[in-house]
Amino acid sequence: MTLEYSISAGHPFCMGVMSQTNGIHIAMPFPESEGKECGMLLYKAGHELARIVFPECYKMGEVYVLFINMQMEADYTYLFFCGEEQFTDPYAHIIRGREKWGRRKEDRPRAAFAEDTFDWEDDMPLRIPYEDSVFYSLHVRGFTKHASSQVSARGTFAGLAEKIPYLQQLGITAIECMPVYEFDEIIPNPAYQESLKLRDNGQAAYLEEPAWKQRINYWGFGDGETYYMATKAAYAKDPQHADRELKLLIRQLHKNGIEIILQMYFSPRYTQGYIREVLRYWVSCYHVDGFHLFGTDIPMRLLGTDPYLKHTKLIHENPEADAVYKGKKIPYYRNLACYGDAFRYDARRFLKGDEGMLSVMAEHMRQNSSLEGVINHITDYRGFTLSDLVSYDRKHNEE
């Protein structure tokens, strides 16, 4: 089968690939691509269909901006190439090849073309003030994976949607989800192949212990191969339509008065512009209510002054509210918030009955900046669950 297509100029309004009725619009950066042939590898049903070379005349800086006029089909996937190197679209909205949790395919994951046909039914973020908020942090897979959850779609977005009545009974106003973007949960060990060589050469005695082959990154944080604009397919009852399943969950949460906050970790290798694009995308396409951001180089000044994010909760250990609002009046909607660990440790000492903690807790309760919210939490993923915290009065390590 031969693919018929034509290439014309595009519009540099946003990065990534956008599927349209008569083709695809591409705005994709190719760093260090001078003198190299760049383009797209198009696949149908897993087999290479076409190798499309991008003309240099459609290059702006490092970005190829063009439109490919072609007949689209539902099962198309793609990769990009730059010289001899192939890479997956870092702006991909759908990733194929990671549908099974903890299983790695030999092939590089490919991007698929997303269709924006979801009916939001006039849904919009809830904008609940911080002073009226009670957050409930959870892991989408872990929250309902056990049989005790009593849901039909355990460990999925659909399973979480079944627990909305339970969440309402708790009296919470928002769930804060650990990463739901397409992170790589498999952590390979570079020493594993070396250990195999030593074993095969009869030198296994030099190994103190057999090297582990791989481990699971359960939480989702880390610097592996991550696609921040794609929904985690392994978290869906129907992995082929994970994006739709998450949108259904968010729409149902909003109908029941519950916000959704997404935890996101960015390592220093991601640019400030990319981080902002990721957040804008999730607000625009998924109607999320906010983000809890982790990382050493999070551009809080840039994000805090972005007009597209003014109604979006932005939570960080240092939201830089003084710099964001310097010389400006108090914001009509406080979207910035500080998330620190001081309250967690002091609250535990207070519950234990340590001396001198009453005044400390009173000071925590009085903290209420006019510029930013203050998130007081007593447990998170770095330690006990809330149930464990209140179930024991002494250590039980011997058991």
Each model region followed by its residue ranges:
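Aromatic- and acidic-residue-enriched carbohydrate-binding clefts of CAZyme catalytic domains
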Residues: 149-156, 187-255, 266-285, 396-399
